[in-house]
């Protein structure tokens, strides 16, 4: 099927947010280790690869968190506990929001409020090693399992909205594991998971062989070929409607990865923005309006007005 594509936004030009920097002493030690033991260098880099950054919560997010009904649930498949948040009337249709790496379930204030205004209740969670969910390290697998457990406990969901790691995890949950929300919306998600390992090794100043060792190690942990985590692979297994949103100025994940994912979707739409980057896109009113409209109708706003590109 030919994906349907649209575009929105003319944000001011400027630098978008980039990946969180790694302190130079950590990089220097990793570079040194690889000359003595590639296995040790791989384990060393993996230690940091699996540890998200934690950030202080701003007052607006803190107030939004206080408005939530909060509970902690166990995810038996990974043996960890996650913090769950809920807003809105309990008899309303449900939307699940999945945050990205180093994010929190309480960060989607504007989107959540618009969903509440549209008559939905909103569920979100802090993935392992994020927010209030405890532990210090995590993997994409644990994002996937957290989403599956949310569906088992609180589903079915009208839609799942996932940003970055949360989005690719949601696509895996739908594609490989058969979750059936009515619709899925992804924002700024990667296609190739292998590429992330090589990019991280490059940031650390490590040789590609170190990335390969980590890929092989984590393939054993996941119990699957890492290629089977890819966005395009799971897109081919997905038959529910999916809206893929990506910014052309995203410096962390190039928008060409979104295009690759959409090409494999049976029922996919691509919405490209320009100038919002990897994170500010989540606060853009036009994008939020498109997400809510898509969840309600399965269409983009410009489709209703006959201006689809």
What are these regions, as identified by a protein language model?
Residues 18-74:
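An N-terminal hydrophobic leader/cap segment in hydrolases
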Residues 105, 112-134:
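Conserved alpha/beta-hydrolase
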Residues 111, 231, 240, 254-261:
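Short alpha-helix in the alpha/beta-hydrolase fold that links the catalytic acid
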Residues 137-158:
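Alpha/beta-hydrolase active-site loop
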Residues 162, 166-170:
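Gly/Ala-rich beta-loop-alpha elbow adjacent to hydrolase catalytic centers
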Residues 175-224:
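Hydrolase active-site cap/lid region
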Residues 237-239, 244-246, 250:
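Short beta-strand/loop motif that positions the catalytic acidic residue
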Residues 276-288:
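Catalytic histidine-centered segment of alpha/beta-hydrolase-like enzymes
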């Amino acid at each position: 099927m030919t994906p349907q594509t649209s575009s929105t936004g003319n944000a001011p030009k400027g630098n978008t947010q980039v990946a969180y920097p790694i302190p130079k002493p950590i990089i220097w030690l990793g570079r040194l280790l690889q000359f003595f033991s590639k296995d040790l260098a791989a384990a060393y880099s993996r230690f940091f690869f699996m540890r998200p950054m934690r950030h202080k919560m701003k007052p607006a997010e803190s107030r939004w968190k206080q408005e939530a009904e909060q509970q902690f649930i166990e995810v038996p498949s990974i043996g960890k506990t996650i913090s769950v948040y809920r807003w809105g009337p309990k008899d309303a249709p449900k939307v699940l929001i999945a945050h990205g790496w180093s994010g929190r379930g309480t960060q989607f204030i504007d989107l959540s409020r618009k969903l509440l205004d549209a008559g939905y209740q909103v569920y979100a969670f802090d993935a392992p090693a994020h927010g209030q969910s405890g532990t210090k390290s995590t993997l994409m697998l644990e994002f996937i399992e957290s989403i599956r457990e949310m569906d088992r406990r609180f589903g079915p969901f009208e839609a799942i909205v996932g940003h970055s790691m949360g989005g690719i995890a949601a696509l895996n949950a739908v594609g490989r594991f058969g979750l059936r929300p009515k619709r899925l919306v992804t924002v700024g998600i990667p296609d190739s998971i292998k590429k992330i390992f090589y990019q991280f090794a490059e940031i650390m100043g490590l040789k590609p062989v170190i990335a390969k060792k980590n890929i092989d190690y984590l393939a054993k942990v996941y119990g699957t070929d890492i290629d089977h985590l890819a966005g395009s692979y799971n897109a081919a297994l997905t038959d529910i409607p999916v809206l893929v949103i990506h910014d052309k100025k995203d410096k962390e994940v190039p928008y060409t990865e979104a295009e690759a994912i959409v090409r494999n979707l049976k029922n996919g739409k691509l919405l490209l923005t320009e100038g919002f980057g990897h994170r500010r896109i989540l606060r853009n009113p036009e994008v939020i309006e498109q997400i809510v409209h898509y969840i309600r109708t399965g269409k983009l706003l410009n489709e209703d007005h006959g201006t689809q590109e």
